[in-house]
């Protein structure tokens, strides 16, 4: 009976050592689930009224890109080229990402600013980066 308990205790100790959690994972900072709003330094725009804004969620590796300009001067081809260039810059800035895939089809929305009365166009792109 003593041999059985000794064998069971040694087996338990051995299994605890084999399946122990690595302490380096515990020392890492937890990933934030908040949305970071990023305004890129290099906007890659040719339209003077255009602005680019990114919303980045580090927990899910998702980025929402918003390209906004006057509706009169909106060109979807330029918006797509700007989005590709800004996403490439974002990928280069974050070394852990090697590519991305589109989560939803890109969309264009038109709206009117109540203060100024201008009509604006917003091009939206929603992507998830892969590690």
Q: For each of these PLM feature ranges, what is it?
A:
Residues 21-131:
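Secreted/extracellular ectodomain signature
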Residues 4-14:
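Sec-dependent N-terminal signal peptides
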């Amino acid at each position: 009976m003593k041999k059985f308990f000794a064998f069971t205790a040694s087996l338990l100790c051995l299994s605890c050592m084999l399946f122990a959690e690595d302490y380096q994972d515990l020392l890492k900072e937890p990933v934030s689930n908040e949305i970071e709003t990023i305004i890129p330094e290099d906007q890659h725009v040719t339209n003077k009224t255009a602005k680019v804004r990114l919303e980045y969620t580090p927990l899910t590796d998702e980025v929402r890109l918003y390209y906004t300009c006057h509706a009169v001067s909106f060109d979807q081809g330029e918006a797509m080229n700007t989005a590709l260039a800004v996403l490439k810059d974002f990928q280069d800035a974050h070394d852990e990402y090697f590519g991305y895939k589109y989560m939803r089809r890109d969309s264009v929305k038109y709206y009117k600013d109540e203060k100024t009365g201008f009509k604006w166009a917003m091009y939206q792109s929603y992507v998830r980066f892969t590690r």
